[in-house]
Amino acid sequence: MTQPTPKPPAVVLADDIPIAHTPPGGFGDTFPQPILTRCTEPLVAGAPDLRGMWRTVSATKAGVPVPSDQKIYRHVQRIEQCGNRLVVTAGGVIHDMRVDGTAEHGVHDVLESDYTTPINVVATYENGVHVLRPVGVPIEITRHLEGDKLIWKYVGDMQVTLQRVGGPNDPPPAT
């Protein structure tokens, strides 16, 4: 008797998973479930592998160390990637985007500061760096790896160094 040939696992593409958005008022203190868990599509060429749960270990503003009692030291972010899609979940927001250089497929969500102000952000990968450019605002937000650390350059000359504390499907650490 012949054994049935096992079926290869189904490929789940980034397109197969609905785009996520920040819930009204943000997600609060409890991280939502990961968005791209089921996705099996490989990362696009040129995408740095930023996947994981990340926690701040140091921060500077205009080159000056930020005091360790500041809120940024409690900052945790989850980065998920699949194909050309990237999702950052942190600070009460879910920024789900295609990293394809278009405003149409970039972030369409709200600011972390008030959870209501709409934003549209173009996302690209440039020389191993994830670059975000808000439409109509002359700034860049970047994330890149330096060894095993994630370097996040944010608005106002803020640079945050984060350490991976888990995978993208792991629960966030206690803060």
What are these regions (language model features)?
Residues 1-85, 163-175:
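Amphipathic/hydrophobic helical signal segments and adjacent flexible N-terminal regions
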Residues 79-83, 99, 125, 144-146, ...:
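Generic beta-strand structural signal
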Residues 89-91, 134-136, 143-145, 154, ...:
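Residue-level recognition of conserved beta-strand positions in structured domain cores
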Residues 50-65, 98-107, 111, 119-130:
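Short, basic/low-complexity N-terminal boundary segments at the transition from targeting/disordered tails
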Residues 75-77, 94-96, 119-121, 138-142, ...:
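A structural detector for short beta-strand units
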Residues 149-157:
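Short, exposed beta-strand-loop hairpins at the edges of beta-sheets
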Residues 117-141, 146:
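Acidic, glycine-rich flexible loop segments
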Residues 65-116, 155:
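N-terminal glycine/threonine-rich, aromatic-flanked beta-hairpin/loop signature
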